[in-house]
């Protein structure tokens, strides 16, 4: 994060350090509560011991599980704990931002492991402990991130909001609580992570071609190689928006199929389809500003 100088990068790095220290402290408290109740931290052992936990251990397990959700939600930048990600990723260098886009999904994967293995449907009194939280958190994250994408006036910040949007989509899908939804989430995670990281690297190439305008979505400076960079941007845009024929379309289709019979299907369909449409609008506007218009027109 601090590979290059700059006030924005120093501020973003400071935020990341403070939040990571806070998250680590909460994580230790959560782990301590779970260990006190079960005497183990091995996930396989936890799954067995949580299922047979006594009434006296249930309180510690619930507290530990919910604290873990808070920690992993902070790592994955979910609402209301995701305020730090857009400015941090927008200020980071391209390689760092691309790596961070991958690391953000680690928080979602941790939620998947804890939710599915430790507090799954066979976890006794703590069965499906995280289920009531995942779907609402995912929906709110998708909503806030979509608004952030639309409001962005810088390509890097727009891409940072897309990272948050993909994390929200994953958590929303995990909240459906089915094997089909989990499979769809894993497929979507692979696609969104690769495309998101690639777009951050592409943003750095665009910035070098635009001079002082960098990645601002204005018309001050045209891109020197619009054909090549424009084609790459178009491919990345349809990939992240979920349009055919790229894998993003299949990933979102699998998510919708897994939600078809769920009681919250209307909310999931609305969130996925509306966010996809608005992302297309935002990326079309960004592409127009970067490749088609200049300050002389």
Task: Give a label for each model feature.
Residues 1-297:
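Alpha-helical transmembrane segments of multi-pass membrane proteins predominantly involved
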């Amino acid at each position: 994060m601090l590979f290059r100088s700059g006030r924005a990068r120093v501020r973003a790095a400071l935020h990341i350090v403070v939040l990571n220290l806070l998250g680590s402290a909460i994580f230790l408290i959560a782990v301590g509560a779970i260990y006190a109740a079960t005497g183990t931290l091995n996930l396989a052992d936890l799954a067995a011991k949580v299922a047979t936990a006594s009434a006296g251990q249930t309180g510690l397990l619930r507290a530990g599980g919910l604290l873990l959700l808070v920690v992993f939600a902070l790592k994955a930048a979910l609402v209301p704990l995701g305020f730090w990600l857009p400015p941090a990723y927008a200020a980071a260098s391209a390689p760092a931002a691309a790596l961070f886009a991958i690391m953000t999904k680690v928080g979602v994967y941790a939620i998947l492991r804890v939710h599915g293995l430790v507090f799954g449907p066979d976890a006794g009194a703590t069965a499906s402990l995280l289920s009531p939280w995942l779907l609402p958190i995912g929906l709110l994250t998708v909503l806030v991130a979509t608004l952030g994408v639309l409001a962005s006036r810088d390509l890097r910040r727009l891409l940072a909001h897309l990272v948050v949007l993909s994390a929200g989509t994953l958590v929303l899908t995990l909240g459906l609580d089915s094997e089909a939804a989990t499979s769809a989430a894993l497929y979507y995670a692979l696609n969104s992570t690769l495309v998101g990281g690639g777009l951050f690297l592409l943003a750095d190439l665009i910035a070098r071609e635009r001079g002082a305008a960098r990645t601002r979505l204005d018309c001050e400076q045209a891109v020197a190689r619009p054909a090549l960079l424009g084609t790459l941007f178009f491919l990345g845009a349809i990939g992240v928006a979920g349009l055919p024929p790229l894998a993003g379309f299949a990933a979102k289709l699998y998510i919708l199929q897994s939600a078809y019979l769920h009681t919250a299907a209307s909310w999931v369909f609305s969130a996925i389809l509306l966010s996809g449409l608005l992302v297309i609008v935002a990326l079309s506007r960004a592409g127009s500003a970067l490749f088609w218009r200049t300050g002389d027109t």
